[in-house]
Amino acid sequence: MYKNIKKFKLESFIAQEIGNLIVSRGIKDPRIHSFLTVVKVEFSKDLINAKVFIGSIKEGASLDNAVKALNNAKGFIQSQIIKRIKVRSTPKLLFVKDDSLSKSFYVNKIIEGLNTIREN
């Protein structure tokens, strides 16, 4: 039970810190824009590896390039996280593209289209 609570707190903290770095432009890479969002963070059972799912709230944004840039900057990101958290070792980060936001935008467009057809 305790490990699950610790894991949940660590996942939410990591997501928040990475989100803050993205929004505050702490990562100096033009491929990383403020429309990126951390969808979720999943830790391995041993809390050594963390998979960070990245989405974009802007339609048509180049998510592939942003994920590559984040993976290139993961050493810097890990160093920033270790300054703010008290753990024995920093989790190894892996950034992964998450299309769930773009899919939800697509579904919303379809629903809006159906609503306009219904109104006419």
From Swiss-Prot:
A Pfam family hit: RBFA
GO MF term list: ribosomal small subunit binding
Listed SUPFAM superfamilies: Ribosome-binding factor A, RbfA (SSF89919)
Gene3D superfamilies found in the cross-reference section: 3.30.300.20
Highest taxon above the source species: Bacteria
PROSITE patterns: RBFA
InterPro entries: KH_dom-like_a/b (IPR015946), RbfA (IPR000238), RbfA_dom_sf (IPR023799), Ribosome-bd_factorA_CS (IPR020053)
Coiled coil region boundaries: none
Main location (coarse class): cytoplasm
GO CC term (a single one): cytosol
GO BP annotations listed: maturation of SSU-rRNA
Subcellular locations according to the entry: Cytoplasm
Keywords: Cytoplasm, Ribosome biogenesis
UniProt similarity note: Belongs to the RbfA family.
UniProt function note: One of several proteins that assist in the late maturation steps of the functional core of the 30S ribosomal subunit. Associates with free 30S ribosomal subunits (but not with 30S subunits that are part of 70S ribosomes or polysomes). Required for efficient processing of 16S rRNA. May interact with the 5'-terminal helix region of 16S rRNA.
PANTHER family named in the record: RIBOSOME-BINDING FACTOR A, CHLOROPLASTIC-RELATED
Summary of subunit composition and partner proteins: Monomer. Binds 30S ribosomal subunits, but not 50S ribosomal subunits or 70S ribosomes.
Protein name: Ribosome-binding factor A
Lineage, opening ranks: Bacteria, Pseudomonadati, Spirochaetota, Spirochaetia, Spirochaetales
